[in-house]
Amino acid sequence: MYKNFNEGMIEVITGPMFSGKSEELLKRIRTLEYAKLKPLVIKPEFDTRFSENEIVSRAGVKHKTHILKNINDVYFLLQEDKYKAVVIDEAHWFNEELVKVADDLANKGYLVIVAGLDQNYLREPFGPIPNLLAIAERVTKLQAICVKCQHAASTSFRKVAASEINLLGDFQEYEARCRKCHNAGQKEKLQKKV
């Protein structure tokens, strides 16, 4: 997984909803634990979809996690034990401070692995992930399957009429779509408004 991991680095796992980001992150956690590199696993307080105190993949794989409201609280947790890595799921719900914290932790020698959406439902850069991508040593961009045409999907299409950017949801609110089908869906939504 990593060649000569002996210094800090940042890895970002990104892609649309339903692409397996949490599953990929859980694989990284298992590898770290197998190698006796203890990870501090966290997620934002905002993410309560499947569990309040666990990362849960759609395949049902789970791992206990610490819940943080403020990403700077990670420094207090790091004092509790000899962690070698910091693993963050649903990182797009943290603010831009995450970029500074991740960079600082990597500079201090931690392996920082972050999973989150890089785009919102409008296909615009979302949260801190785009800036993390710029400073990451390793990037894994996953794809889902478009529910309309079954081609590779790179976007999360919002099916409901809500306009706020931060809308927690799952299959009822979102679906994976390719660029073409996403654009067609957005056009259809606009026509319904008229």
Swiss-Prot record:
Presence of the UniProt keyword Transit peptide in the record: no
Keyword Secreted (UniProt): no
Major localisation: cytoplasm
Gene Ontology CC terms, in alphabetical order: cytoplasm
Residues involved in ATP binding: 15-22, 89-92
Active site: 90
Localization (cell): Cytoplasm
Binding site residues for Zn(2+): 146, 149, 178, 181
This enzyme's EC code(s): 2.7.1.21
Keywords: ATP-binding, Cytoplasm, DNA synthesis, Kinase, Metal-binding, Nucleotide-binding, Transferase, Zinc
Cystine crosslinks: none
Subunit structure: Homotetramer.
PANTHER family registered for this protein in UniProt: THYMIDINE KINASE (PTHR11441), THYMIDINE KINASE, CYTOSOLIC (PTHR11441:SF0)
Name by which UniProt lists this protein: Thymidine kinase
Name of the gene encoding the protein in the UniProt record: tdk
